[in-house]
């Protein structure tokens, strides 16, 4: 939480099924980091144990086998993964090819720079079929889809509705 407050990173957590198992602080950070305005955890600091709030809002991606705790799942856009079968042939990531991703990184940064005013002023319609928390979860991605345009606004909203329906089944 101190790192999040100071550097405002994007949090990428792999092996979440083992990492979160007995890590109450991490679950609190994930749960508390859902809303930009109210996202904070309180911790005592210094020799006097003075209570201090730490902001914990940050974009987060959590990869894991299985489902997270209900409170984490309710604050998430869940994309279910499955364990790779022994017969599946997957090309591993080669660190030396990392440089191939830099042009994409630069294009995304440029796109954001060119569109940040539109994104900040966008008040996207979210699918009414979603519950209130799910609507909060998808609002930013709907704004991005609206600014991108084309088929993306409709495609994205339909995908969110289908994900919500699958979760209810």
Language model feature labels by segment:
Residues 1, 14, 49-50:
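Aromatic/His-enriched, Gly/Pro-containing loop or helix-boundary segments
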Residues 2-5, 21, 52-54:
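Short, charge-rich binding segments
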Residues 12-14, 41-45, 54-65, 78-80:
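Structural recognition of the conserved hydrophobic beta-strand(s) that form the central parallel beta-sheet
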